[in-house]
Structures are given as structure tokens and as C-alpha cells.
């Protein structure tokens, strides 16, 4: 009986009015190329498009004190997009030392410096120009008036893009320092010694934030002085300095630590040893 009922509804239903339907497609565009022979550039662009056959407009019935919905049918296109761009390169420094320090074996120190900058952006799809969000005025039984925000596409199959503009610029630097000593004991003729496997730092700037746009400074250190052991350490330094309010109570203000001639406020650190078993 249940199966026959579903089949009967299916055969006599209206595809647009009786079914929750929609179509969505995603278009990612990515590339990777080298600029000026040294700069690695990676741009990307993502576009998401949703197509709906209806939208729901809401209003407030003051007499009945209920929300009223009105569904209108037609073609509605709801899209959003975002883009990003990253660029990185590697800079090498070499230092050749005196062989007298290592029993007349030639040795060399190599420093690899890897800076990277990234940019990402997405517009505010909650803006009135897109029409993805709307408002109506609500007056309750006590005469209190409020503005209710909603999206005509919130119950649609693929939803609606989020509100708010996003945009950030991120920086990251990484350092690697290793030594090579000429030796007859290695088949390559050289023995590599890791001095600093990685010493790095990262930070970002939120262009869409109203205040405190700079993130905290994160630093990391990795050492591999022994074959199977790795030492990791991470530390965080706060960007914004403490200030005092009118009552003398401290709070995080809008002035940076480096603006006051300081490196940053130490927030904490973590460290660990890792041991790797070779088969």
C-alpha cells in the first residue's frame, strides 16, 4: 500500500513545486608556474554555482503574530567564489671553512632560506547586491519592534553562501642549516650533518577584521642531531600589547608590541622528542 501510494504521488506530482530540487557545479582552477626562474607562483580560483527553481520570501503577520512564507517559482542563480595566490622561493648561502678544524677534511655549511607569502580573498555574499539575504520587520504583542534577517534560499538543496568578507595575507619563513664534510667512509664522498633541520616563523594579517588584524607570531624549531631522534619545539608570541583602562585594569589593546619597541609577549611553548624505528 505504501509503495503504491509513493508511486501514485510520484506520477502525479509537479517536479518544480512538489520536489525539493536544485543543481550545483563547482569549477576549481589551479596553476603552478615559475616566475623569473626563481619564484614559484601558485594561483587558484574556485567558483560554486547553485541553481534553484524557487525562493521563499518571509514576512510578519502582526495580527496573527506568526511568520508568513510566500514561495515564488522561477530560475534563481546563487553563486560564490574565492581566490588565493601563493609565492615562494629558495635562497642559498654557502660557507667553506678551514679543514684544520676537522683533521684536514674540507667542510662546508649550507644555509637554505625559504620565504613564502600567501593571499586569499572572498567577497561578502551577504551584501544586498547579491540578494542572498533579506530582512523583515517583526512587531510582537507588546509592541516591540525588531528586524529579522533570513535567506530566501536557506532551505534549498545546496544552501546559501555564508556572510562576511574574508581576506588575509600570510607570511612564512623557514631556515635549514647543514654541514658537509669530505670523508672516505661514505660512498658519496661526503658526510652530511644536520645543524638546524628547520627554524621557522609564521604570521598573518586579516584584512577583513575590524580590530587586531595581526595574528600572533608562531615560531618552530626542529633538530635532528642524532640518527633516529628528532627534537621539536614550538613557541607563540602575542602581537598586541597590554594597556590599562580608566580603572587601572589591564586589557589587550590595539597597539602592537613591536610598536612599543618589544619583540612580542611570550605566550607559551611546547617541546617533544620523537624516536623513529628503522626497519
Which residue stretches match the model-derived regions?
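Outer-membrane beta-barrel translocator/pore domains, especially the C-terminal barrels
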Residues: 3-279
Amino acid at each position: 500500500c505504501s509503495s503504491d501510494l509513493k508511486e501514485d504521488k510520484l506520477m502525479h506530482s509537479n517536479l518544480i513545486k512538489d520536489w525539493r530540487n536544485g543543481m550545483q557545479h563547482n569549477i576549481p582552477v589551479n596553476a603552478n608556474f615559475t616566475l623569473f626562474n626563481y619564484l614559484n607562483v601558485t594561483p587558484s580560483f574556485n567558483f560554486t554555482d547553485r541553481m534553484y527553481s524557487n525562493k521563499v520570501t518571509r514576512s510578519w503577520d502582526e495580527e496573527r503574530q506568526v511568520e508568513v512564507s510566500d514561495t515564488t517559482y522561477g530560475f534563481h542563480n546563487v553563486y560564490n567564489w574565492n581566490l588565493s595566490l601563493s609565492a615562494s622561493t629558495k635562497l642559498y648561502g654557502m660557507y667553506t671553512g678551514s679543514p684544520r678544524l676537522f683533521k684536514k677534511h674540507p667542510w662546508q655549511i649550507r644555509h637554505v632560506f625559504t620565504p613564502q607569502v600567501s593571499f586569499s580573498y572572498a567577497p561578502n555574499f551577504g551584501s544586498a547586491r547579491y540578494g542572498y539575504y533579506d530582512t523583515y520587520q517583526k512587531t510582537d504583542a507588546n509592541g516591540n519592534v525588531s528586524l529579522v534577517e533570513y535567506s530566501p534560499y536557506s532551505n534549498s538543496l545546496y544552501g546559501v553562501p555564508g556572510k562576511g568578507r574574508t581576506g588575509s595575507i600570510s607570511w612564512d619563513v623557514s631556515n635549514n642549516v647543514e654541514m658537509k664534510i669530505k670523508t672516505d667512509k661514505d660512498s658519496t664522498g661526503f658526510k652530511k650533518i644536520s645543524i638546524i633541520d628547520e627554524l621557522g616563523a609564521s604570521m598573518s594579517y586579516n584584512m577583513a577584521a575590524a580590530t587586531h588584524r595581526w595574528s600572533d607570531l608562531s615560531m618552530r624549531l626542529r633538530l635532528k642531531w642524532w640518527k633516529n631522534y628528532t627534537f621539536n619545539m614550538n613557541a607563540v608570541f602575542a602581537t598586541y600589547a597590554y594597556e590599562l583602562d580608566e580603572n587601572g585594569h589591564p586589557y589587550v589593546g590595539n597597539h602592537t608590541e613591536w610598536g612599543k619597541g618589544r619583540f612580542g609577549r611570550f605566550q607559551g611553548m611546547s617541546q617533544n622528542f620523537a624516536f623513529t624505528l628503522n626497519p
